[in-house]
């Protein structure tokens, strides 16, 4: 649609109100208004512009975005992303979830369909988190509440245990695994064994850093599962650390007298996460 006041293109979500969804719509609008205060552009969250009625239908206007990560994977014929593509996506998701966690909100519906590319041609892998229709305040979530798509559902949801913002982190881990392995699998050990052999020591170390982070996010215990802030400080996502480590390694490899050895003789999943 086109905003006649500004001339800009917007995306409009139209709710078909059958008399039973008015409360759901009201909750979604209230959630969107709360999230709108968080500086959506800075924090990688879709910009909610306004809500209005048209022909007795409730409409929500959002900024126009490109396509979802699911659409992108489908266009690629399900060829997995490489780590240099997964890294910025994960980093931006952590920023988004860190800020919504700060105001006590759980998204509850993370999946590749709800991660939108902003403009993939001009800003490759610049993403925004969308669809807060099922978002809840953590203080209002009761034990036994069923949430999240089944393939991305945290174990504490399935087991009927107390729920916190940690359920969203499980969802992020599932998305990371999906982007890297082409399909989501909870058996990471088997997935790693079937993954192509390392191409170089640099690639191998990066892969091990990614897998270590992924396993810590997919921690079965929500109390010890990494938080978004933990992940932002992780070497795999800490851009400055990653650049510095790679630069130092390249310099070492280029020295004429360099004698580089590796303790890793085959690709194996980290046996211990610290």
Listing of model-derived features with the role each one plays in the protein:
Residues 101-119:
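Catalytic-loop of the protein kinase fold
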Residues 89-90:
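Activation segment signature within eukaryotic-like protein kinase domains
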Residues 39-50:
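Conserved HxN/HPN-centered segment at the entrance to the catalytic loop
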Residues 224-261:
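Regulatory extensions flanking the kinase catalytic core
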Residues 54-63, 70-71:
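A conserved loop-to-beta-strand element in the N-lobe of protein kinase catalytic cores
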Residues 183-213:
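C-terminal lobe substrate-recognition/regulatory segment of protein kinase catalytic domains
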Residues 1-16:
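Glycine-rich ATP phosphate-binding loop
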Residues 14-41:
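Conserved N-lobe beta3->alphaC-helix segment of eukaryotic protein kinase catalytic domains
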């Amino acid at each position: 649609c086109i905003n006649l006041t500004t001339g800009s293109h917007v995306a409009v979500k139209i709710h078909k109100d059958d008399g039973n969804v008015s409360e759901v719509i009201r909750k979604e609008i209230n959630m969107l208004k709360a999230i709108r205060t968080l500086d959506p552009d800075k924090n990688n969250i879709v910009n909610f512009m306004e809500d209005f009625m048209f022909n007795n239908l409730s409409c929500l206007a959002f900024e126009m975005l490109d396509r979802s990560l699911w659409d992108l994977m489908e266009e690629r014929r399900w060829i997995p992303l490489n780590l240099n593509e997964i890294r910025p996506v994960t980093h931006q998701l952590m920023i988004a979830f860190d800020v919504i966690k700060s105001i006590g909100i759980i998204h509850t519906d993370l999946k590749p369909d709800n991660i939108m590319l902003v403009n993939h041609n001009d800003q490759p892998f610049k993403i925004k988190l969308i669809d807060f229709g099922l978002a809840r305040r953590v203080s209002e979530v009761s034990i036994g509440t069923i949430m999240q798509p089944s393939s991305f559902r945290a174990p504490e949801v399935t087991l009927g245990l107390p729920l916190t913002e940690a359920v969203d982190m499980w969802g992020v881990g599932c998305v990371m695994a999906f982007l890297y392995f082409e399909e989501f699998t909870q058996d990471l050990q088997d997935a790693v064994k079937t993954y192509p052999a390392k191409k170089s020591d640099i690639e191998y170390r990066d892969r091990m850093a990614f897998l270590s982070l992924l396993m810590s996010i997919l921690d079965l215990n929500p109390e010890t599962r990494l938080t978004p802030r933990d992940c932002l400080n992780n070497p795999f996502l800490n851009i400055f650390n990653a650049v510095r480590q790679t630069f130092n390694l390249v310099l070492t490899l280029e020295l004429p007298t360099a004698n580089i050895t590796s303790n890793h003789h085959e690709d194996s999943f980290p046996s211990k996460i610290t």
